């Protein structure tokens, strides 16, 4: 079984009820944080996972809302680890290493203060960055993480992840429009976690910059169509824009159900979904 927790279901627009985009995936004794949006560590604490309990950080792309708390995560993991400092594995698209280096540099004075003050902190936060666009990015203890390109242009490159364990599988799409590479990555998966925006509402915004968001994100219906093409068993919607207003969950769900007739999950931060083997309707390949 793979457990998915929607830590942050929000967007770049601050929302008192929703943290920034971030999802926790637990599989085979490992914990993966997918993206680290605004407020993620508060939601991690509520979900019972500490920064030093993560096996790896998976970044779908380098938009600010998906990496807003990267620096906080790196520093917190470092100062709350009281055993050997094992490097945090960070898997992301090309550009990730530069971003991580710049983030640590931004905290350079803080890191220096702490090393000077605490004798057991002798080096900056240890990280190992793996830049990938496709293929197997992680394979340990029966847990495999596969990567494939997505389409969030002009943001490029962007990637999605597929986590597999004991015949269960979950795909995390990140921000993307429908594309063949995501269809292939999601084929036969137990669940697809997908960003969803209400284009019918966003297109009404008076500001062109807001309307342009529709150009490189999937609508609720498009996310559902991707899930149906892939034959997944469960569609998990997240990263809602605009935020789902209280009482409007049924409307969002109904829009997805026009294209996807099976289990549809959406909700507030900390919504949890269990993905068991055998829930897909179309075997991979």
UniProtKB/Swiss-Prot annotation:
Report the transmembrane regions from the record: none
CDD domains this protein is in?
arylsulfatase_AtsA-like_MBL-fold
Keywords for the protein's UniProt record, in alphabetical order? Endonuclease, Hydrolase, Metal-binding, Nuclease, tRNA processing, Zinc
Q: What is its EC number?
A: 3.1.26.11
SMART domains in the record = Lactamase_B (SM00849)
**Which residues bind Zn(2+) 1 per the record?**
61, 63, 152, 175
Query: Does the entry feature the keyword Manganese, yes or no?
Result: no
Q: Spell out the reaction equation it catalyses.
A: Endonucleolytic cleavage of RNA, removing extra 3' nucleotides from tRNA precursor, generating 3' termini of tRNAs. A 3'-hydroxy group is left at the tRNA terminus and a 5'-phosphoryl group is left at the trailer molecule
Cofactor note as given? Binds 2 Zn(2+) ions.
Name any one Pfam family assigned in the record.
Answer: Lactamase_B_2
Q: Drop me one GO molecular function for this one.
A: metal ion binding
Cysteine disulfide links: none
Residues noted as binding Zn(2+) 2 in the record, renumbered to the chain: 65-66, 175, 239
Instruction: List cofactor names only.
Output: Zn(2+)
Q: Which InterPro entries match?
A: AtsA-like_MBL-fold, Metallo-B-lactamas, RibonucZ/Hydroxyglut_hydro, RNase_Z/BN
Catalytic center residues: 65 (proton acceptor)
Subunit structure, as described in the record:
Homodimer.
Q: Which PANTHER family match?
A: ZINC PHOSPHODIESTERASE ELAC PROTEIN 1 (PTHR46018:SF2)
- Protein family according to the UniProt entry: Belongs to the RNase Z family.
| Function field | Zinc phosphodiesterase, which displays some tRNA 3'-processing endonuclease activity. Probably involved in tRNA maturation, by removing a 3'-trailer from precursor tRNA.
Name of the protein this chain belongs to: Ribonuclease Z
């Amino acid at each position: 079984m793979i457990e998915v927790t929607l830590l942050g279901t929000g967007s770049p627009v601050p929302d008192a009820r929703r943290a920034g985009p971030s999802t926790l995936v637990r599989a085979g004794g490992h914990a993966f944080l997918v993206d680290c949006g605004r407020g993620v560590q508060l939601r991690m604490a509520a979900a019972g996972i500490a920064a030093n309990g993560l096996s790896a950080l998976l970044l779908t792309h380098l938009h600010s809302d998906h990496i807003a708390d990267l620096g906080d995560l790196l520093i917190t993991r470092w100062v709350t680890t009281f055993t050997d400092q094992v490097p945090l594995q960070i898997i992301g698209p090309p550009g990730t290493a530069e971003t991580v280096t710049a983030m640590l540099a931004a905290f350079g004075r803080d890191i220096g203060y702490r090393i000077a003050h605490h004798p057991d902190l002798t080096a900056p936060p240890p990280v190992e960055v793996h830049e990938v666009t496709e293929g197997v990015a992680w394979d340990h203890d029966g847990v495999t993480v596969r990567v494939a390109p997505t389409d969030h242009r002009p943001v490029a490159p962007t990637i999605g992840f597929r986590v597999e364990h004991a015949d269960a599988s979950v795909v995390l799409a990140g921000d993307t429009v429908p594309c063949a590479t995501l269809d292939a990555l999601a084929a036969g998966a137990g669940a697809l976690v997908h960003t969803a925006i209400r284009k019918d509402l966003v297109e009404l915004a008076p500001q062109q910059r807001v309307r342009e968001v529709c150009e490189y994100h999937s609508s609720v219906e498009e996310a559902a169509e991707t899930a149906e093409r892939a034959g997944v068993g469960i569609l998990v919607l997240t990263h809602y824009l605009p935020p789902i207003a209280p009482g409007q969950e049924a409307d969002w769900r109904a829009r997805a159900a026009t294209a996807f007739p099976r289990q549809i999950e959406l909700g507030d931060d900390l919504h949890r979904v269990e993905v068991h083997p055998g829930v897909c309707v179309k075997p991979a390949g």
